[in-house]
Amino acid sequence: MGGAAGGKTYLGWWGHLGGPKQKGIITYSLSPFQQRPMAGFFKTSTQNMFRRVMTEGLYVAIPFGIAYYIYCWGKERNEFLNSKHGRHLVEE
């Protein structure tokens, strides 16, 4: 099962598959001293973050507000039902 295939099916190892050499491929590179990977990062990132927060704020704030209201209501209701007055009302 393991190992390289033998006979007519073996083409060669990775990078040396036995095919014709590639021609006509031109690559360009830029010196690391000429690159500016962080150019404009702080200027554009803060504006982009502010824009995204403003556009997506309602999609997050409204469900969060509803969930917080339900949480507060449940907590208050639980405290009431575990008080003397609450237990007295439940028994009736």
From Swiss-Prot:
Record's bilayer topology term: Single-pass membrane protein
Q: Which UniProt keywords apply?
A: Electron transport, Membrane, Mitochondrion, Mitochondrion inner membrane, Respiratory chain, Transmembrane, Transmembrane helix, Transport
Which stretches are Mitochondrial matrix in the membrane topology? 1-50
Record-annotated membrane-spanning stretches: 51-81
Which residue ranges are assigned to the Mitochondrial intermembrane compartment in the record's topology? 82-92
Question: Which Gene3D superfamilies does this entry report, sorted A to Z?
Answer: Cytochrome b-c1 complex subunit 8
State where the protein is found: Mitochondrion inner membrane
- InterPro entries cross-referenced by the UniProt entry: Cyt_bc1_su8, Cyt_bc1_su8_sf
Does the keyword field hold Cell division?
A: no
Superkingdom in the source lineage: Eukaryota
An example GO biological process term is: mitochondrial electron transport, ubiquinol to cytochrome c
What is the role of this chain?
Component of the ubiquinol-cytochrome c oxidoreductase, a multisubunit transmembrane complex that is part of the mitochondrial electron transport chain which drives oxidative phosphorylation.
Q: Subunit details for this protein?
A: Component of the ubiquinol-cytochrome c oxidoreductase (cytochrome b-c1 complex, complex III, CIII), a multisubunit enzyme composed of 3 respiratory subunits cytochrome b, cytochrome c1 and Rieske protein, 2 core protein subunits, and additional low-molecular weight protein subunits. The complex exists as an obligatory dimer and forms supercomplexes (SCs) in the inner mitochondrial membrane with cytochrome c oxidase (complex IV, CIV).
The name this protein goes by in its record: Cytochrome b-c1 complex subunit 8
